[in-house]
């Protein structure tokens, strides 16, 4: 049994039986874990209103196998006030993490980035795109996705802000005259290295890059949060 309280957030919930749920959590010291929340679907369960997304939680669990049982859960603070765009963006972040993080692998630095991301989504709804791009880059780094944005992978020369570069998976960025979805301008690559998305063109390029880079981790199944976002606000995800 986990004796000390563990900080965590709900990433995803799914029905397990008539009265229970399987809940994916992102925890500070244990990474992504799936816990059985017994009886939580019953009307009088004290945990029913606690196990909600975007609520900072304190957790305890027990068990020796792969599937452990949640024993205690308390809100560490109030649920973050997500509104419309921020809400769907938060669901997107949660779904990405639920898919890409290895079970029982600690990502303490990414947990802090996640907390910062959620706080900023709730407090800065007009800055959603740069907030998401920053977190996507931080997630790629936590996964060990190493790419050099500052040097040509073929020659080792510093990236020229005015030149175009072709992204090749497992290699990096190579100077090229080709123009396609894998082409990026040098100035944007240098901005990626600093996670500086203050310019609109760089922000759009960053979104294109993270979609390419995250695809091998996410798999072929479409993101449900993105489909929901598109159905409610179809113009927001174009491009």
Curated annotation (Swiss-Prot):
The keyword DNA repair applies. GO terms for biological process: DNA recombination; double-strand break repair. One of its GO terms (cellular component) is bacterial nucleoid. Keywords: DNA damage, DNA recombination, DNA repair. HAMAP family: RecO (MF_00201). Belongs to the RecO family. This is DNA repair protein RecO. The gene is recO.
């Amino acid at each position: 049994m986990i004796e000390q309280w563990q900080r965590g957030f709900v990433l995803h919930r799914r029905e397990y039986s008539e009265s229970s749920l399987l809940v994916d959590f992102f925890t500070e010291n244990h990474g992504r874990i799936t816990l059985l929340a017994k009886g939580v679907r019953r009307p009088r369960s004290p945990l029913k209103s606690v196990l909600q997304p975007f609520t900072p939680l304190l957790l305890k669990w027990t068990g020796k196998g792969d599937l452990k049982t949640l024993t205690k859960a308390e809100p560490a603070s109030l649920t973050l006030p997500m509104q419309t765009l921020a809400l769907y963006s938060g669901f997107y972040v949660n779904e990405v993490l639920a898919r890409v993080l290895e079970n029982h692998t600690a990502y303490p630095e990414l947990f802090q980035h996640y907390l910062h991301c959620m706080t900023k989504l709730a407090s800065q709804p007009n800055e959603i795109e740069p907030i998401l791009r920053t977190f996507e880059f931080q997630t790629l780094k936590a996964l060990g996705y190493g790419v050099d944005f500052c040097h040509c992978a073929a020659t080792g020369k510093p990236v020229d802000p005015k030149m175009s570069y072709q992204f090749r998976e497992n290699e990096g960025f190579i100077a090229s005259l080709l123009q396609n979805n894998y082409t990026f301008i040098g100035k944007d690559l240098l901005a990626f290295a600093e996670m500086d998305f203050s310019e609109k063109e760089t922000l759009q390029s960053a979104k294109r890059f993270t979609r390419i880079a995250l695809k091998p981790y996410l798999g072929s199944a479409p993101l449900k949060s993105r489909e929901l976002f598109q159905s409610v606000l179809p113009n927001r995800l174009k491009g």
